[in-house]
Amino acid sequence: MSEITVRPMMPEDWTAVSKIYLEGIATEHATFQTNCPPYTAWDASHTRECRLVVLDDGVVAGWAALHRVDPRWCYRGVAEVSIYVGEKFRGKGLGYHLLTALCREAEQAGYWTLQSTVLQDNAPSRGLHLKCGFRVVGRRERIARDCHGRWLEIGRAHV
């Protein structure tokens, strides 16, 4: 049995984190993004706290982070979740370890609402969020087009 560890993400994790992000992008059902930004852009768009990686026997196998949904003071406790698990590590429960740790850390950091945008055809992510206590609060149709011109829809989940 492998050893699972969740720890804060460090800048030196970026090579592994960006590789995992690119794997998620390649699925075409994890994000609207079509490329991975450079670290400086990613770093500027995510909160300083609540950045985690999950390790499987010492190897970075996934990551999770938050970004604010709105800069206004009244929304200071609301953040959007990003969570990705590497292709060869999927289906092992690592996402559950990572998302539950992120939710705990977010609560300790003063966040009162976490939201997640999940593409409708991403059943594993929907299941993970529901298992971790998120609930579906809405759906947005024809929100974006993918690289093939197909309309995408998303579900919104909150915890």
Regions found by a protein language model. Give the residues of each.
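Conserved acetyl-CoA-binding loop-helix of GNAT-fold acetyltransferases
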Residues: G91-R104, G127-K131
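Conserved small/polar residues in nucleotide/adenosyl-binding loops
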Residues: A157-V159
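A short beta-loop-alpha structural element at the N-terminal edge
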Residues: I4-V17
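Amphipathic alpha-helical recognition patches that constitute DNA-binding helices
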Residues: A16, E80, T113, P124, ...
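Conserved GNAT acetyl-CoA-binding A-motif
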Residues: A106-V118
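Conserved GNAT-fold acetyl-CoA-binding loop/helix
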Residues: W14, S18-A44
